[in-house]
């Protein structure tokens, strides 16, 4: 299965190609996407993205995980979370969300098994 491209991004709004739902924050993986609801894991801007936010995507067999930290990069990504992803044998890339979407789409367009989590506001 291929990773779906992100069709559009604006403040507080993301669309994934082939999906009728729009998201504020989202998770994408080969063959699917869904809302990234921070309440599920108790995530906040600080300390930031937790391994539990990423487990679902890592189970999908991605080779690369792209993390979008928000338009102003307010969402933190602790070193322990990066270490967790790397220990799973997955390359991890962290960017401001607009740049993260560009990188994710470039990898998806090449047919790579890429996943991502994207914060579309601050």
Swiss-Prot record:
Any GO BP annotation: positive regulation of fat cell differentiation
Locations listed in the record: Cytoplasm
Keywords, comma-separated and alphabetical: Cytoplasm
Broad class of the protein's primary localization: cytoplasm
Superkingdom assignment: Eukaryota
UniProt xrefs under CDD domains: Mth938
GO terms for cellular component: cytoplasm
Location of region: MTH138-like domain: 6-122
PANTHER family: MTH938 DOMAIN-CONTAINING PROTEIN (PTHR15811:SF5)
Annotated family: Belongs to the AAMDC family.
The protein's name: Mth938 domain-containing protein
Originating organism: Danio rerio
């Amino acid at each position: 299965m291929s990773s779906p491209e992100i069709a559009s991004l604006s403040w507080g709004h993301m669309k994934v190609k082939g999906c009728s739902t729009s998201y504020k924050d989202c998770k994408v993986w080969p063959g699917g996407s869904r809302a990234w609801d921070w309440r599920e894991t108790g995530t906040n801007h600080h300390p930031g993205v937790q391994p539990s936010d990423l487990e679902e995507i890592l189970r999908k067999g991605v080779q690369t995980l792209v993390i979008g930290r928000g338009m102003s990069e307010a969402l933190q990504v602790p070193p322990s979370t990066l270490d967790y992803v790397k220990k799973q044998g997955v390359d991890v890339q962290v960017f401001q969300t607009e740049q993260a979407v560009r990188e994710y789409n470039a990898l998806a367009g090449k047919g790579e098994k890429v996943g991502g989590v994207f914060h579309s506001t601050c």
